[in-house]
Amino acid sequence: MKTIRIIGAGLSGCEAAYYLLKKGYFVELYEIKTIKKNPIQHYDYFCELAYSDSFRSTDLNTSVGTLKKELELLDSLIIKAAKYASINQNNELVVNRIEFSKYITNYLKTFNNLKIIEQEYLNIDLNIPTIIAIGPISTPSFLTNLKKIINKKNLKLFDTVEPTILKQSINKNICYSLDNNLDYLYCDLNKEQFEKFYNALISAKTFNSPLKNEIKLLEKNNYFSIESLAKNKQEFINHFKPINNNAYITITLKKDSVIDNLYTIVNFQTSLMWNEQLKVFSLIPGLENLKIMRYGVMHKNNYINTKKLLNLGVQLKTNKNIFFAGQIIGVDGYVESVCSGLISAINLDRYLNNKKMILPNKNSTIGSLYNYLLKTDSNFNPMRINWALVDLIDGFELSDNSKKFYSKRAIELIKQYLKKINYK
């Protein structure tokens, strides 16, 4: 019986373990939390959640709802657990966190081919097939050892994300480009518009992190949010110098390096609550009908340069025994972490059986996420699933009425993927 190691019993690690245990591998699952908990951990069960509502919508018209459906078709343990522990009946999947974690822990423990090792995993053995599925608050000792095999330049420790918006929600009659260079668009604010925007920004509510002093930690490392910058009004004004002589300030939008349908609001990394981001940033002229596809966040995180380090099987290019899963590869969100664990396990199994490693089609939600991660540039920020990551269907621009067609296509593509990998 072939031995596989999985480092981390979070969402991605447990999803990977479940798949490989079913395949008959002997799985060594390393988890340190029973002997050393990080600041946001409280229980000894696997897959401890910080929030009960982070599985988000079950509506198939949403990208995350479709992603959960794709995972369900792939027999996801985590989705089974979430449904078991669900505490509501509407379109939001809210779970009892303790019951959710208990379900997964107890289910995995029924496998005789699982060995749970409750200790810190320090020395990465390159000769043993391994999935590294660590979370955003990993131990310094493990990160030190990880840097030895990937080079410390390829590991980021903080997440400072600017809001990413849908191109079609930008008013091109107000926002403009220079010399027809559509890589950048510009939004001018006169003094009256600026004052309204500025006052809304400084009075907006910020996210309350479960990690104590997280914002201070970020600022200590020279990562400042747009709301922190706004504490000094004149400095804020100087930061957004006008391009047009008639403007008081100018805000820049930058096209995404992979997806033409997305733009980021430059220098707007933020800890504002999501509803506040929509309210405040829609005050920018040209963004009145703003659709945010990925909200800005700022928090402690560990993630690697996926495009540079990993191949299409999420396998380390320099050592074929090492695979990665979870937030470490640059996915953002609970459900996204689940799918990364499953894909890593599928491809590790295929690698060990001398089969070609494959990903789902890029127009499935799972495939679109990997297509983005494996193509984006080295300065990317973690991405969560959204419909802008898939190719547009001819005649169907992204809208509330057209999303059902995108969902139907994605689910059909996952069914084709199941046949391709002979999933049982």
UniProtKB/Swiss-Prot annotation:
It is found in: Cytoplasm. Keywords: Cytoplasm, FAD, Flavoprotein, Methyltransferase, NAD, NADP, Transferase, tRNA processing. It catalyses: uridine(54) in tRNA + (6R)-5,10-methylene-5,6,7,8-tetrahydrofolate + NADH + H(+) = 5-methyluridine(54) in tRNA + (6S)-5,6,7,8-tetrahydrofolate + NAD(+); uridine(54) in tRNA + (6R)-5,10-methylene-5,6,7,8-tetrahydrofolate + NADPH + H(+) = 5-methyluridine(54) in tRNA + (6S)-5,6,7,8-tetrahydrofolate + NADP(+). Belongs to the MnmG family. TrmFO subfamily. Its EC number is 2.1.1.74. Its cofactor is FAD. One of its GO terms (molecular function) is flavin adenine dinucleotide binding. This is Methylenetetrahydrofolate--tRNA-(uracil-5-)-methyltransferase TrmFO 1.
